[in-house]
């Protein structure tokens, strides 16, 4: 784990593979190392109106995990009520997600914190507007990537395709997390062993169902 000012992008092999759980745990781990750490979710789809503001549950978890005081608008520049693809949710309310606006918010957070942990929405290539995907945002911010693999049937293919996409974009896959979201998966150890052999990046945590991640340095 780098101890200087830096940032990481958390992506996943699919939606609902535990990105927020892992991102929040990583933020807590960084705080325990004596660092100022803050989470960011640039685009969130799926929120409830609370005291006149749309709040996304993932964003709330990221805020709770960190130790940096920052405005909600910086941590979550774009939030939409329906839990649908971000670019569709944005279109329904006449909004176009701007990478420049996200960059500005990120820069402010990076000035405040030692580490910014940026969590994506959905998978690596999820569209955020009609021309750009989450991958374009990561390229713009030049962030090293941590891949959360939801360990279930089909995860090897999903993980290898996502890792290939990350590297094809010229980005650095600095590590991956085996998140055992299906504890009853047949041949689970063999699947994880295959991932360790083929992903060509360190497994920074192997998370059993219902347990807290134990990160290794990376």
Kindly label every feature range from the protein language model:
Residues 5, 35-36, 112-114:
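Short, high-confidence coil segments that cap the C-terminus of an alpha-helix
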Residues 50-51, 86-90, 127-129, 158, ...:
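Short, well-ordered secondary-structure micro-motifs
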Residues 84, 196-215:
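Beta-strand-loop-alpha "switch" segments that mediate conformational coupling across diverse proteins
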